[in-house]
C-alpha cells in the first residue's frame, strides 16, 4: 500500500508541475513540436527513463566533419593562394558534398522521424538497458497526427511498436492550449501496451 501511495504521489506531483502549452492551432510545425515535447515529457518524467543522445550525436559528428573540410579549404587557400590550392579545394568540395549525402541518408534511414530515444535501466543493474523510441508525423495541411512508440528489449534485441493516429483537435482546446491530461492517456496507453507485451513474453 505504501509503495502504491508513493507512486501515486509521484504521478500527482508530475501533473501539478505541468504548465499549460499554448500554440497557434494553424501552425502545423508548432502543433507537432508541442505534441512531440509532451510525449517526450511523459516517458522521461512520468516513467523515469533516461534520454539517449546517440542519434543526435551521430548527426552532429557528420556535420562537424563536413565543417572541417570547409575550414581546411579556407586555411589552405589562404596559405596557398589559387591556383596552387586548386587540388585541395576540389578535394574538400567533393568531400563536403559526400558528407552531405551521408547526412541525408542518415536522417532519412537512421533518424527517420525519431525525436526521442530513451533508456530503461534494469533496477538490479544486471540486464542490458531496454530502449524506447518515439517518432511522429503530421502532414502539411492535415490534422491527423501519428505517434509511434517502439520498444527494443535490451537482452533479446527484439523490437515491437505500436501507434495511434488522431486529429490534433482531440488534444487542443479552442484557445490552442494542449490538454495534457487527455494527451497523456494516449501516450501512456501506447507505453502500457508495449510494457504488457514485454512482461507476457
UniProtKB/Swiss-Prot annotation:
Classification via InterPro entries: Spc2/SPCS2 (IPR009582)
A GO cellular-component term linked to this record: signal peptidase complex
Topology feature Cytoplasmic, residues: 1-59, 108-201
Membrane-spanning parts: 60-80, 87-107
Top-level division of the source organism's lineage: Eukaryota
Function: Component of the signal peptidase complex (SPC) which catalyzes the cleavage of N-terminal signal sequences from nascent proteins as they are translocated into the lumen of the endoplasmic reticulum. Enhances the enzymatic activity of SPC and facilitates the interactions between different components of the translocation site.
PANTHER family: MICROSOMAL SIGNAL PEPTIDASE 25 KDA SUBUNIT, SIGNAL PEPTIDASE COMPLEX SUBUNIT 2
Subunit structure: Component of the signal peptidase complex (SPC) composed of a catalytic subunit sec11a and three accessory subunits spcs1, spcs2 and spcs3. The complex induces a local thinning of the ER membrane which is used to measure the length of the signal peptide (SP) h-region of protein substrates. This ensures the selectivity of the complex towards h-regions shorter than 18-20 amino acids.
Protein name per Swiss-Prot or TrEMBL: Signal peptidase complex subunit 2
Gene behind this protein: spcs2
